[in-house]
C-alpha cells in the first residue's frame, strides 16, 4: 500500500462522503465520537466519515485514543484513510481494523479486504493495542514490527503461514493471539519476548515447537489447541510462571514429565490426543484433563503415516438468527448456531447429505423433566430429525448458567430417548469464569437441556458382589454381598446435604442434626436376594460414643407415598464412632435424624420441602424515559441489591416485594390491575396475565408495554401489578400443596407493586398513528411470521431517541438519516415512522427482512423491542400452524414431550 495520499485526493474523498454539508458539518458528524472513543466499524461509509473529520480537524479529534474501523471497505479508500492516522490521531492508543461484520450465504464470517498496512502507521508512538482479526493478511505488515510500544497484537482469522523473526524485538508485547491461521512453524526469536504473558496459537498447522519457546519467562497462558503437534520440547518446563497450558486436539504421543513440576500450573488440558501412557506425576495430578486419549491401550501394529494426519480443514458454519437449518455432508463440519450452541460432525458421521433443523425452546414444566433436587441451567434445544442414528457420535456444546452451589453437585446434559429422559456423560469446558460449556457426544438428535443435580454414582452389581461409594461424601457406602443378585443389575446413588442451621430454625431445637439424605435406585427386580449393607455418616456433631440412641431415628420414604416413615425399630443399627450401618433388601430414600421430637415423619416432610424451596423477591420497574415499558423480574434474595444497582440507572419503581418462597419449575403470573393493561398480543399473555415459570438459575425477567383506557391528559393513572401463583411442579409433596389450599384464595397471591403512568400534557397525548395514512403492509411470510402495519407502528412507538442507531444498522445511509431529521425536525414520532415505513416498503417481498430488523434492534441495544418482535412472530407462526393443521395440510412433526412425559426414574418401592 502507498503510505501517503495527495491532499486533493483526500479532500475529494471527504467531499464524496457528504457534498451537501456546510462549514459546521463537523460538529454534526461527532455523534460517532464518545469521549475519547471513535467507533465507525458498524456505520456504512466509516472511512469516508473519518476522512471528512480529518479534513475539518475538530478539537475533539485530537483527543481520540480508541478507533474502530471496518475493513469491509474499498481497498483504496481504506488505504487513504489509514495513511491519515499518524497526522490526525497522534494520541491513538488502540486501533481495531477488523473484518467479520459481513457473512456469506451459509452464515460464515467474511474476511476483510485488508492485506497490508501503510508504513507510516509506525509513527503512532502511543499505540499499545492493535487488532487486525478477520482480514486477508498473508504476511505481517512491516510497520507492526516497528511499533515499540505495542502491548497487545491480535491476528486471528487471517492467512498467515509464518511469523517474522523480527517479532521477537517488540519489547512491550504482553498479549499475542494468532488463532485460525495457517502457521506451520514458529520463529526461534519468539522466545525473546520476555514480557509476553498470554500466547494463543490454536487452530493452526503447527507440528513442532522451537526449543526457544522455553525462554518466555513471563508467560502465564499458552494455548496450542487444535494443531498437529506430535511432541513437546523439554524446554516447556522452564516456563515457571505458566498457569494455563492448553494442548487438546493434537497428535501428542508423549508429554514431558517435568510439566508436573511447574509451580503455578493450575490447568493442563491434554484431551483428544494420542497419549497411551503418561508419567505418574501427570497421571495423578488434579489439574490435568485427559479425556479422549487411548490411555492403557496397545499401540497399533503399523503406525499411521504422517501424510494421513494431513486431514483437510473441516468446513465451519456460523448461523445467523434468521436461519434455523443447515446442511451436513459426509465430509463433516463444525457449526455454531446463533444462540451460541456448537456442534461438530466428524467426517463420515452421515453417509448422505442431510439437513439439520434446530429450535431453542423456552423451558416449561411439561418440557423440562427435573428430579426433586435438580436445577435447570439452560433453555431447551431441539435438534431434528429425531431418531436418525449417526455413524459416528456428534459433538455437542451447550452454554449454561454456572450453578451457584457446586459442592456435591454436578452438571449434566439431559436428553430424551425412546419416550424416557436420561443423562449423558458430560464434560465441562471453561472459556471464561462465567462462560461455561457442557460438552457431550450424541448418537442421534432429540431434545437437550443442561441441569445441575446432586452428584450421582453408579455401578453394575455382579453376582459376586461389589462396593459402591459416593464421590460427593466418601462416608456414604453401599456394600453388596455375594449372591445379592442373580443377574448383573445397575444401581445408582445420590447424596443431598441440608444445612444444620436451617434444620435447627425449622425445629426450634439447637441440638437437632441430620445426616446427608441418601437416594438409592436400581434396575431389575425391586428386592435383592441378600441384605445389602448401607453406611451413613452420623448427623453432624454427633459421635457413636456420646449419642442418646432414643433420639436417633432412621427415616424411609418410598415414592409416590406422601409420608416419611420411621423404621428405626425395624432395622438393626450398628454404630461406630462416625457411622451408622444398617441392612435393607430394597432401595429408596434414607435419612438419619437426631432430635428430641417424637413425630419425626412430619418434620421430615417439612424439612425436605424446605430443601427445595427458593427464597425470592419480585420487582416491577418502569423505564425512566418511557414509563409505559415495565420490567418484571423474579430474583433470588441474595441477588436483589446488585441487580437493582445495575437497573436503577435506566429504571425506577417501588421497592422489591417481601420475600416469598417458590419451587423450581413453579408457574406464576403477573396481572396488571386498576386501569392498566398489557399493550401487546403476546404468546405468554393468557387472559391479560403474563405467564412465568420460575427456574432459580435463569433470569425470570420480561419487559412488557402497558397502556390504559383512562384519560391520561386529565390525571395520572395509578395502577398496580400483582403476582399470583400458578401450577406447582408435580413432584412437590402433596402436603405442601394442601397447606396452600387450606389458606384460602389469598394463598395464590404473592405480592402487589404500584405502577404509575404519568399525566400527559396536551401536546404529549397519544398520537401514535394519528392521521397517518400508509398503504397496507405485511413484512415477512406466513411460515416465519408477519409484521403488519400496526406491528410496525408499535415498534416505532418504542424506539424513541434510539431510532438513528437502528436506522444505521438497517442499512439506511447516514445522509438519509440526517435528511429525515431535518425534514421532520419538530416531530420525533414522524421521524421514526417515516424511517421505519420507508425501509419496510423497500424490503416488502424480500426474504430475511424481519430477521434484519430483529438483528438491527439487538445491535442497537434494544433487546426489549427485539423480544417483543419475536413474540409477535411466534404468535403469528402458531396461528398459521394451527390453521393449516385444522385444514389437514400440516406435515407430520415430532410432538413436543408434554406433561405426560415420564419424569426421571424414582427409586423403586418394594
Curated annotation (Swiss-Prot):
Start and end residues of each stretch annotated as Disordered: 1-25, 884-910
Active site: 444, 446, 586, 588
InterPro entries, per database record: DEATH-like_dom_sf, Death_dom, Leu-rich_rpt, Leu-rich_rpt_typical-subtyp, LRR_dom_sf, LRR_domain-containing, Peptidase_S68_pidd, ZU5_dom
Signal sequence, start to end: none
Induction entry: Up-regulated in response to DNA damage.
Effect of residue 826 to K: Partial loss of complex assembly with CRADD
Tissues expressed in: Ubiquitous.
Ranges for domain Death: 788-873
Post-translational modification: Undergoes autoproteolytic processing whose extent either directs cells towards survival or apoptotic pathways. Autoproteolytically cleaved into two main fragments PIDD-N and PIDD-C. PIDD-C can be further processed into PIDD-CC, a processing which is enhanced by DNA damage. The cleavage producing PIDD-C is required for translocation of PIDD1 to the nucleus upon DNA damage and activation of NF-kappa-B. PIDD-CC mediates the interaction with CRADD and the cleavage producing PIDD-CC is required for the activation of CASP2. PIDD-N remains associated with PIDD-C and PIDD-CC after cleavage.
Pfam family, one: LRR_8
Impact when changing residue 587 to H: Loss of the proteolytic cleavage producing PIDD-CC
LRR repeat residue intervals: 126-147, 149-171, 172-194, 195-216, 218-240, 241-263, 264-285
Residues bearing the modification N-acetylalanine: 2
Effect of residue 828 to E: Loss of complex assembly with CRADD
Function: Component of the DNA damage/stress response pathway that functions downstream of p53/TP53 and can either promote cell survival or apoptosis. Associated with CRADD and the CASP2 caspase, it forms the PIDDosome a complex that activates CASP2 and triggers apoptosis. Associated with IKBKG and RIPK1, it enhances sumoylation and ubiquitination of IKBKG which is important for activation of the transcription factor NF-kappa-B.
Known partners and oligomeric status: Forms a complex named the PIDDosome with CASP2 and CRADD. Forms a complex with IKBKG and RIPK1. Interacts with FADD and MADD.
Name of the protein this chain belongs to: p53-induced death domain-containing protein 1
Organism annotation: Homo sapiens
Lineage: Eukaryota, Metazoa, Chordata, Craniata, Vertebrata
Amino acid at each position: 500500500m502507498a503510505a501517503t495520499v495527495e491532499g486533493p485526493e483526500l479532500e475529494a474523498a471527504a467531499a464524496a462522503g457528504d457534498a451537501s454539508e456546510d462549514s459546521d458539518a463537523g460538529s454534526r458528524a461527532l455523534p460517532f465520537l464518545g469521549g475519547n472513543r471513535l467507533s465507525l466499524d458498524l456505520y456504512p461509509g466509516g472511512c469516508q466519515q473519518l476522512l471528512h473529520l480529518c479534513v475539518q480537524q475538530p478539537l475533539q479529534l485530537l483527543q481520540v485514543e480508541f478507533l474502530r474501523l471496518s475493513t469491509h471497505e474499498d481497498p483504496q479508500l481504506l488505504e487513504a484513510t489509514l495513511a491519515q492516522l499518524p497526522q490526525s490521531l497522534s494520541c491513538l492508543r488502540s486501533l481495531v481494523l477488523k473484518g467479520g461484520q459481513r457473512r456469506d450465504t451459509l452464515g460464515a464470517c467474511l474476511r476483510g479486504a485488508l492485506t497490508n498496512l501503510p508504513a507510516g502507521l509506525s509513527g503512532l508512538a502511543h499505540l499499545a493495542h492493535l487488532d487486525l482479526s478477520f482480514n486477508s493478511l498473508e504476511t505481517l505488515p512491516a510497520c507492526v514490527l516497528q511499533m515499540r510500544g505495542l502491548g497487545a497484537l491480535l491476528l486471528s482469522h487471517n492467512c498467515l503461514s509464518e511469523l517474522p523473526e523480527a517479532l521477537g524485538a517488540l519489547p512491550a508485547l504482553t498479549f499475542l493471539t494468532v488463532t485460525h491461521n495457517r502457521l506451520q512453524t514458529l520463529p526461534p526469536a519468539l522466545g525473546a519476548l520476555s514480557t509476553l504473558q498470554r500466547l494463543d496459537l490454536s487452530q493452526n498447522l503447527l507440528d513442532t515447537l522451537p526449543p526457544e519457546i522455553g525462554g518466555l519467562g513471563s508467560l502465564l497462558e499458552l494455548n496450542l489447541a487444535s494443531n498437529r503437534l506430535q511432541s513437546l520440547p523439554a524446554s516447556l518446563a522452564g516456563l515457571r510462571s505458566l498457569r494455563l497450558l492448553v494442548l487438546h486436539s493434537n497428535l501428542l504421543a508423549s508429554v514431558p514429565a517435568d510439566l508436573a513440576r511447574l509451580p503455578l500450573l493450575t490447568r493442563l488440558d491434554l484431551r483428544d490426543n494420542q497419549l497411551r501412557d503418561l508419567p505418574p506425576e501427570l497421571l495423578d495430578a488434579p489439574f490435568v484433563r485427559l479425556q479422549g486419549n487411548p490411555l492403557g491401550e496397545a499401540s497399533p501394529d503399523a503406525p499411521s503415516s504422517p501424510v494421513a494426519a494431513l486431514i483437510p480443514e473441516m468446513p465451519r458454519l456460523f448461523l445467523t438468527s434468521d436461519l434455523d437449518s443447515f446442511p451436513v455432508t459426509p465430509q463433516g463440519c463444525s457449526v455454531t448456531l446463533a444462540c451460541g450452541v456448537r456442534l461438530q460432525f466428524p467426517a463420515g458421521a452421515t453417509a448422505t447429505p442431510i439437513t439439520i433443523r434446530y429450535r431453542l425452546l423456552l423451558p416449561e414444566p411439561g418440557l423440562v423433566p427435573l428430579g426433586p433436587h435438580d436445577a435447570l441451567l439452560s433453555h431447551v434445544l431441539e435438534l431434528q430429525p429425531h431418531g436418525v442414528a449417526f455413524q459416528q457420535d456428534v459433538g455437542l456444546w451447550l452454554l449454561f448458567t454456572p450453578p451457584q452451589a457446586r459442592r456435591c453437585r454436578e452438571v449434566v446434559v439431559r436428553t430424551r430417548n425412546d419416550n424416557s429422559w436420561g443423562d449423558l456423560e458430560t464434560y465441562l469446558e471453561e472459556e471464561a469464569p462465567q462462560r461455561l460449556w457442557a460438552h457431550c457426544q450424541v448418537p442421534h438428535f432429540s431434545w437437550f437441556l443442561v441441569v445441575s443435580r446432586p452428584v450421582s454414582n453408579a455401578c453394575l452389581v455382579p453376582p459376586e458382589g461389589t462396593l459402591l461409594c459416593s464421590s460427593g461424601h466418601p462416608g456414604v457406602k453401599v456394600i453388596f454381598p455375594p449372591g445379592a443378585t442373580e443377574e448383573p443389575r445397575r444401581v445408582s446413588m445420590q447424596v443431598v446435604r441440608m444445612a444444620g442451621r436451617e434444620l435447627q430454625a425449622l425445629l426450634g431445637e439447637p441440638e437437632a442434626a441430620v445426616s446427608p439424605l441418601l437416594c438409592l435406585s436400581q434396575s431389575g427386580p425391586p428386592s435383592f436376594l441378600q441384605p445389602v449393607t448401607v453406611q451413613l455418616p452420623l448427623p453432624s456433631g454427633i459421635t457413636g460414643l456420646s449419642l442418646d440412641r432414643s433420639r436417633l431415628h432412621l427415616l424411609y420414604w418410598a415414592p409416590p407415598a406422601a409420608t416419611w416413615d420411621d423404621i428405626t425399630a425395624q432395622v438393626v443399627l450398628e454404630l461406630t464412632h462416625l457411622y451408622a450401618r444398617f441392612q435393607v433388601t430394597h432401595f429408596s430414600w434414607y435419612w438419619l435424624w437426631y432430635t428430641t421430637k417424637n413425630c419425626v415423619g412430619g418434620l421430615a416432610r417439612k424439612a425436605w420441602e424446605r430443601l427445595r424451596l427458593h427464597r425470592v423477591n419480585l420487582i416491577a420497574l418502569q423505564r425512566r424515559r418511557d414509563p409505559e415499558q415495565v420490567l418484571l423480574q423474579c430474583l433470588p434474595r441474595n441477588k436483589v441489591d446488585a441487580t437493582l444497582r445495575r437497573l436503577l440507572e435506566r429504571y425506577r419503581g417501588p421497592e422489591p416485594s417481601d420475600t416469598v418462597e417458590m419451587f423450581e419449575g413453579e408457574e406464576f403470573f403477573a396481572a396488571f390491575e386498576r386501569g392498566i393493561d398489557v399493550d401487546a398480543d403476546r404468546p405468554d399473555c393468557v387472559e391479560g396475565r403474563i405467564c412465568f415459570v420460575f427456574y432459580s438459575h435463569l433470569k425470570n425477567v420480561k419487559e412488557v408495554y402497558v397502556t390504559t383506557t383512562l384519560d391520561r391528559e386529565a390525571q395520572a393513572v395509578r395502577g398496580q401489578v400483582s403476582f399470583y401463583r400458578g401450577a406447582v411442579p408435580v413432584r412437590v409433596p402433596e402436603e405442601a400443596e394442601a397447606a396452600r389450599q387450606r389458606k384460602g384464595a389469598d394463598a395464590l397471591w404473592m405480592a402487589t407493586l404500584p405502577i404509575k403512568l404519568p399525566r400527559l400534557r396536551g401536546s404529549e397525548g397519544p398520537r401514535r398513528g394519528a392521521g397517518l395514512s400508509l398503504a397496507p403492509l405485511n413484512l415477512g411470510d406466513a411460515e416465519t411470521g408477519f409484521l403488519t402495519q400496526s406491528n410496525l407502528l408499535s415498534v416505532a412507538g418504542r424506539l424513541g431517541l434510539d431510532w438513528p442507531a437502528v436506522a444505521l444498522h438497517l442499512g439506511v445511509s447516514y445522509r438519509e438519516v440526517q435528511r429525515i431529521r431535518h425534514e421532520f425536525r419538530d416531530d420525533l414520532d414522524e421521524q421514526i415512522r417515516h424511517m421505519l415505513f420507508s425501509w419496510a416498503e423497500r424490503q416488502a417481498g424480500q426474504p430475511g427482512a424481519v430477521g434484519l430488523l430483529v438483528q438491527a434492534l439487538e445491535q442497537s441495544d434494544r433487546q426489549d423491542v427485539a423480544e417483543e418482535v419475536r413474540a409477535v412472530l411466534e404468535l403469528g407462526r402458531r396461528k398459521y400452524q394451527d390453521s393449516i393443521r385444522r385444514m389437514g395440510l400440516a406435515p407430520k412433526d415430532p410432538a413436543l414431550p408434554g406433561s405426560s412425559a415420564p419424569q426421571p426414574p424414582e427409586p423403586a418401592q418394594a
